[in-house]
């Protein structure tokens, strides 16, 4: 069964169990985050009704139902966080066995985990990493935690995912900067400057690691920018990028703006390798505004910034700049779980 379909089936089963266990009075967690996220999802859902692929509507509704169930569930957050940390370790071990040849891959790439390419695999590892990093430990457990974190980092490097490597470094620096902010407060300018220089150097180095790939993405972004012009307010519609990109690319390559290197790099593209750009193209400025409203709600949730939920949301935000994480059901699950974990206010419904 495909993972996306399994995602929907799992939510239906979980929802049925929860409805069966609910008492006469239902407590619904309603706050600014709930309202803003619901409005954003509602807008995307309405847009999905005007497409021929109605399965998108099913995915969107399933995601919102999962958000409601998790917001109102009484499951232990610490236990679930530990499970996600274990999932990250097991996935990393699986990828390591693929790299060493003990498990064969059905792909051109040497490390893909249970995904179709390294991008999805690296994203799953990176999103589990904060839950392992934030685990409390001492003595021998501290050593095991360090080795497990190192395993995840090594496997992401072996996968060749440049976005994954960059995200791991950002999350690690952010975690320790927040955890030990009192110690580095006096020399914060030194540490901030050093961290910024390190990340800038890493970013430039990762670009030169695969220069053709980086140039190809820049070309995709330039062509994609042309898709925003016609319907900038409401967007071109859900799923429109796949249909509109290739004609727009042909138009760009035949113009005076394109050079020979652009014509060499051009190819068949189904995603702009930037989720924010995709949102602007398909949902327009309205979608961007509703997304920013949800982002404001996250920062107003009074949650500590060195928690795994916030660090995972940061990871998704970085991945969304250079890849296509929302292609995978696991990423949808993680962002919904993290949003549902933030502070909430209950309202009793009779």
PLM features per residue range, with description:
Residues 1-5, 23-26:
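Short, hydrophobic transmembrane alpha-helix segments
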């Amino acid at each position: 069964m495909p993972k996306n379909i399994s995602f929907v089936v799992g939510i239906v089963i979980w929802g049925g169990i929860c409805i069966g266990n609910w008492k006469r009075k239902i407590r619904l967690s309603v706050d600014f985050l709930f309202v803003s996220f619901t409005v954003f999802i509602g807008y995307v859902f309405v847009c999905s009704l005007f497409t021929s692929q109605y399965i998108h509507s099913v995915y969107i509704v399933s995601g919102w139902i999962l958000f409601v169930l998790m917001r109102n569930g009484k499951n232990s957050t610490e236990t679930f966080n530990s499970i996600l940390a274990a999932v990250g370790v097991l996935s990393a071990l699986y990828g390591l066995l693929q790299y060493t040849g003990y498990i064969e891959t059905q792909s051109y790439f040497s490390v893909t985990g249970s995904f179709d390419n390294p991008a999805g695999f690296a994203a799953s590892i990176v999103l589990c990493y904060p839950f392992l990093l934030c685990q409390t430990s001492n003595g021998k457990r501290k050593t095991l935690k360090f080795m497990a974190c190192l395993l995840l980092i090594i496997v992401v490097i072996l996968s060749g995912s440049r976005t994954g490597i960059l995200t791991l470094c950002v999350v690690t620096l952010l975690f320790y900067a927040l955890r030990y902010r009192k110690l580095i407060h006096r020399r914060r300018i030194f540490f901030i400057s050093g961290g910024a220089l390190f990340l800038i150097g890493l970013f430039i180095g990762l670009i030169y690691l695969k220069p053709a790939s980086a140039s190809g993405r820049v070309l995709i972004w330039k062509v994609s920018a042309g898709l925003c012009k016609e319907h900038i307010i409401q967007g071109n519609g859900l799923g429109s990028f796949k249909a509109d990109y290739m004609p727009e690319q042909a138009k760009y390559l035949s113009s005076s703006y394109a050079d020979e290197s652009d014509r060499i790099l051009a190819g068949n593209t189904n995603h702009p390798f930037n989720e924010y750009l995709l949102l602007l193209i398909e949902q327009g400025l309205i979608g961007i505004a509703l997304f920013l409203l949800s982002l404001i709600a996250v920062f107003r949730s009074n949650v500590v910034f060195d928690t795994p939920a916030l660090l995972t949301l940061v990871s998704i935000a970085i991945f969304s700049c250079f890849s296509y994480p929302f292609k995978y059901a696991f990423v949808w699950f993680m962002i919904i779980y993290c949003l549902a974990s933030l502070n909430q206010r209950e309202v009793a419904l009779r």
